[in-house]
Swiss-Prot record:
One of its GO terms (biological process) is lateral ventricle development. CDD domains: PAX. It comes from the Eukaryota. GO terms for cellular component: nucleoplasm; nucleus; transcription regulator complex. Disruption phenotype: Mutant mice fail to produce small pre-B, B, and plasma cells and therefore lack any immunoglobulin in their serum owing to a complete arrest of B-cell development at an early stage. It comes from Mus musculus. Residues 94-142 are annotated as: RED subdomain. Residues 19-75 are annotated as: PAI subdomain. Transcription factor that plays an essential role in commitment of lymphoid progenitors to the B-lymphocyte lineage. Fulfills a dual role by repressing B-lineage inappropriate genes and simultaneously activating B-lineage-specific genes. In turn, regulates cell adhesion and migration, induces V(H)-to-D(H)J(H) recombination, facilitates pre-B-cell receptor signaling and promotes development to the mature B-cell stage. Repression of the cohesin-release factor WAPL causes global changes of the chromosomal architecture in pro-B cells to facilitate the generation of a diverse antibody repertoire. Keywords: Developmental protein, Differentiation, DNA-binding, Glycoprotein, Neurogenesis, Nucleus, Paired box, Spermatogenesis, Transcription, Transcription regulation. Residues 182-218 are annotated as: Disordered. Expressed in all B-lymphoid organs, in the embryonic midbrain and in adult testis. This is Paired box protein Pax-5. The gene is Pax5.
Length: 391
């Protein structure tokens, strides 16, 4: 079948094309195919030609052929769609009024709930109902109150006194600005100079708990304000801040020069001024600090004999294993002071408090005749006591 006998190719239809496709056919970028090409695609499809063969013979992309045929089978039209057009307007005045009415009745109503209600009340159908994003945009632009309008007086009672003070202090705009926080809330704030002066006074009167509000030489100079120190002392203090925090080998081995003696004397004179400033910055007084810190506490001295005779509650007295000897008398004499050491052999008190109750916290076990029968228990091994007291 010869398709190009009575039908011109797209190359001869238009001039000034935008490009050439993969099949060698020309096209104008962004514009639809001519109606004659569309009609020829439909005619070939009616003749039973496959879409891939139509695409190859007419030099039109396969996607374009499929799209044109699909639209023709659905609608019966070969006309192209609207290029650059928009959807029909769904936010009609009636729909906007209904959305505003729903929002006034229930301010916490979601956009999807408004959309479902519009469909339920037959205000819109499935084709004309606005989307959720469109409803949110309508509420934001047409239903809600614009920000430049004053807030009703009834909403002022919600704001507490503390929050009003904080909001007015945070706002840096002028009092007449409608876009500031004070302008939106209808709060008349004082002038900027008054706020700045109050902020400066608040910095001086309320330091942070550790006594240092802002580090650095500039802030320290601002706090001094030339009242506590002379100009010479301020220069010395500046040199101290400029000096390195860690001394190197040259500064540690270098002797003090004569011209540095005046500097050190001036630094010594800073002690009084720094003490006064620290007393003003710190919140508690030195007397309160001294009273809160406990003084030195005395602890009783435990001698060697008392330590040996002391046993922890719930534990048996210490018995060294067999074969381990005790300290001799000369050794104990060197370890214990003479006033505490009597010279008698080191012995342990009798085992009068030693029983089986410390090993068995459950009293029911002690009631068994097995633990109290001499045959079952047997005699205590005397080797431990003999090794303990043999000296």
């Amino acid at each position: 079948m010869d398709l190009e006998k009575n039908y011109p190719t797209p190359r001869t239809i238009r001039t000034g094309h935008g490009g050439v496709n993969q099949l060698g056919g020309v096209f104008v970028n962004g514009r639809p195919l001519p109606d004659v090409v569309r009609q020829r695609i439909v005619e070939l499809a009616h003749q039973g030609v496959r879409p891939c063969d139509i695409s190859r013979q007419l030099r039109v992309s396969h996607g374009c052929v499929s799209k044109i045929l699909g639209r023709y089978y659905e609608t019966g039209s070969i006309k192209p769609g609207v290029i650059g057009g928009s959807k029909p307007k769904v936010a009609t005045p009636k729909v906007v009024e209904k959305i505003a009415e729903y929002k006034r009745q229930n301010p916490t109503m979601f956009a999807w709930e408004i959309r479902d209600r519009l469909l339920a009340e037959r205000v819109c159908d499935n084709d004309t109902v606005p989307s959720v994003s469109s409803i949110n945009r309508i509420i934001r632009t047409k239903v809600q109150q614009p920000p430049n309008q004053p807030v009703p007086a009834s909403s002022h009672s919600i704001v507490s006194t503390g929050s009003v003070t904080q909001v007015s202090s945070v706002s840096t705009d002028s009092a007449g600005s409608s876009y500031s926080i004070s302008g939106i809330l209808g709060i008349t704030s004082p002038s900027a100079d008054t706020n700045k002066r109050k902020r400066d006074e608040g910095i001086q009167e309320s330091p942070v708990p550790n006594g240092h509000s802002l580090p650095g030489r500039d802030f320290l100079r601002k706090q001094m304000r030339g009242d506590l120190f002379t100009q010479q002392q301020l220069e010395v203090l500046d040199r101290v801040f400029e000096r390195q925090h860690y001394s190197d080998i040259f500064t540690t081995t270098e002797p003090i020069k004569p011209e540095q003696t005046t500097e050190y004397s001036a630094m010594a004179s800073l002690a009084g001024g720094l003490d006064d400033m620290k007393a003003n910055l710190t919140s508690p007084t030195p007397a309160d600090i001294g009273s809160s810190v406990p003084g030195p506490q005395s602890y009783p001295i435990v001698t060697g004999r008392d330590l040996a005779s002391t046993t922890l509650p719930g534990y048996p007295p210490h018995v060294p294993p067999a074969g381990q000897g005790s300290y001799s008398a000369p050794t104990l004499t060197g370890m214990v002071p003479g006033s505490e050491f009597s010279g008698s052999p080191y012995s342990h008190p009798q085992y009068s408090s030693y029983n089986d109750s410390w090993r068995f916290p459950n009293p029911g076990l002690l009631g068994s005749p097995y633990y109290y029968s001499p045959a079952a228990r047997g005699a205590a091994p005397p080797a431990a006591a003999t090794a303990y007291d043999r000296h």
